[in-house]
């Protein structure tokens, strides 16, 4: 089963390339609804659309009908539609797919179940690879989903009659993706060299604002994150300052390109890694829990994470002005509800922010959305034990604020790190490596997600509690580490 948007991805054609020489019996159903998450883009989408809508192609039905009637008479009329449909399927668009060794059938109505069964049974009897092209309507069966297919691609709880979300979240608080998108638009309005790039995720990454107001500075490359990275590198070579907005989990696809085409070349590309950390409603595949581990070893890379949406705006501005390969990671969903400045400000590269001083017992270095949890844990420990735990908003994974970290290692007997990322190879590992290299004797406690794939969940709080990442569990880990240090 292949979605039509998958035809914008190179891996699909790598598989197609093997069909003629390796496969005798194979059925590929091309589910063509002209959508991935958003509207499809590119040459393949254009080609499929022309196959379906070209008036010359569609006239084949009526022309074949007239031909059969004239040749065989009225009794043959009942067979006309079948003959015309088969002729259309076998003749018109077949050349494209037959180059890959497929016999092409279709397009047919994917919602006509008897017709679909008839074609599938025919495909089963074939001794050669077949591609069956079916046309469907994204969201069919639910009017609200048909009206807004992009919104319902990954739906939160909603009213089945109106289609409106039943979430109780504060609508006055912007999503991180929207805060990023609006900031990018503001920056791009002042500088035509600032451009936004998405891999078929304009709405999901917040680039819909740029698409609407500055379409000439917006580029959708289709579901092809690796191409998005190389495309950004090419634009950077020509003096542009590209911002590529990609989900953290999909950055894995673009890793090689980010390494060789961006970081090795020291090109000024900013990658905005949306859905970094937990993304519970999107399922196990969408948790962004590995990006620090695979990006941290890249020379020339700058990696950061904001504690709130206002800091995200500052980081985006800092990155596009830095002239360096930068990666900003931030979570799914609502921001912290802080007041955002009218205009973003630059942040000093590699500098953390002390939010709470310690009494020389322990300091928590928290990254991004875990800063709030660290503050809660520190306050709870002080209330319970009378011990004042320090808290630092780390901001940067790379370059790490080494100067501040070493000072705090001399002052405290314990350094704790907390991150919305796997513990292995993440921010905590960077802190531990720095302290070990400097021969510091303080204890280190790394709090992050365990070495396993985190499953789908209904909400962040439930998954955090399940895997030892809730505020209470962080507090208990710190207390235990204090006793052992």
Language-model features: locations:
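Short pre-catalytic strand/loop immediately N-terminal to key active-site residues, enriched for Gly-Thr
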Residues: 215-220
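DG-centered beta-turn motif at the end of beta-strands
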Residues: 1-9, 32, 97, 243
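Helix-enriched interaction subdomains in cytosolic or periplasmic regions
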Residues: 157-161, 296-341
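Catalytic phosphate/nucleotide-handling subdomain of diverse soluble enzymes
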Residues: 231, 242-245, 255-257
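Acidic/histidine-rich catalytic neighborhood of metal-dependent amide-processing enzymes
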Residues: 6-19
């Amino acid at each position: 089963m292949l979605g039509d948007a998958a035809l914008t991805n190179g891996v699909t054609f790598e598989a197609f390339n093997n069909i003629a020489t390796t496969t005798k019996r194979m059925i590929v159903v091309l589910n063509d609804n002209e959508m991935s998450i958003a509207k499809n883009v590119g040459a393949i989408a254009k080609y499929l659309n022309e196959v379906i809508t070209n008036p010359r192609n569609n006239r084949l039905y009526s022309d074949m009908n007239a031909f059969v009637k004239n040749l065989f008479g009225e009794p043959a009329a009942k067979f006309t539609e079948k003959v015309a449909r088969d002729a259309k399927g076998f003749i018109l668009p077949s050349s494209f797919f037959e180059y890959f060794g497929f016999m092409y059938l279709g397009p047919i109505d994917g919602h006509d179940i008897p017709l679909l069964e008839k074609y599938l049974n025919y495909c089963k009897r074939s001794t050669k690879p077949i591609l069956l092209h079916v046309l469907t309507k994204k969201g069919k069966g639910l009017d609200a989903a048909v009206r807004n297919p992009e919104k319902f691609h990954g739906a939160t709880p909603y009213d089945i009659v109106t289609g409106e979300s039943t979430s109780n979240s504060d609508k006055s608080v912007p999503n991180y993706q929207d805060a990023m998108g609006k900031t990018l638009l503001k920056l791009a309005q002042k500088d035509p060299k600032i451009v936004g790039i998405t891999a078929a995720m304009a709405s999901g990454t917040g680039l819909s604002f740029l698409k609407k107001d500055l379409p000439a500075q917006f580029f959708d490359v289709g579901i092809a994150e690796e191409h998005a990275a190389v495309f950004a590198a090419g634009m950077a070579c020509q003096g542009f300052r590209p911002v590529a907005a990609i989900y953290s989990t999909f950055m894995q696809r673009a890793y090689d390109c980010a390494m060789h085409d961006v970081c090795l070349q020291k090109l000024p590309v900013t990658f905005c890694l949306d859905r970094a950390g937990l993304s519970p409603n999107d399922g196990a595949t969408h948790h962004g829990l590995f990006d620090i581990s695979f990006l941290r070893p890249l020379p020339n890379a700058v990696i950061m994470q904001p504690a709130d949406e206002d800091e995200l705006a500052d980081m985006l501005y800092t990155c596009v002005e830095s002239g360096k390969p930068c990666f900003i990671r931030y979570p799914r969903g609502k921001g912290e509800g802080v007041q955002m400045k009218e205009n973003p400000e630059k942040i000093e590269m590699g500098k953390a922010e002390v939010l709470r001083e310690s009494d020389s017992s322990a300091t928590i270095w928290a990254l991004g959305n875990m800063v709030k949890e660290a503050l809660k844990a520190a306050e709870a420990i002080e209330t319970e034990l009378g011990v004042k735990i320090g808290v630092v908003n780390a901001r940067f994974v790379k370059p790490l604020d080494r100067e501040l970290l070493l000072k705090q290692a001399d002052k405290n007997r314990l350094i704790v790190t907390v991150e919305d990322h796997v513990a292995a190879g993440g921010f905590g590992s960077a802190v531990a490596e720095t302290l070990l290299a400097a021969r510091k004797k303080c204890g280190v406690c790394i709090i992050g997600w365990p070495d396993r794939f985190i499953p789908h969940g209904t909400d962040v709080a439930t998954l955090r509690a399940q895997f030892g990442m809730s505020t209470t569990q962080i507090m208990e880990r710190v207390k235990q580490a204090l006793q052992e240090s």
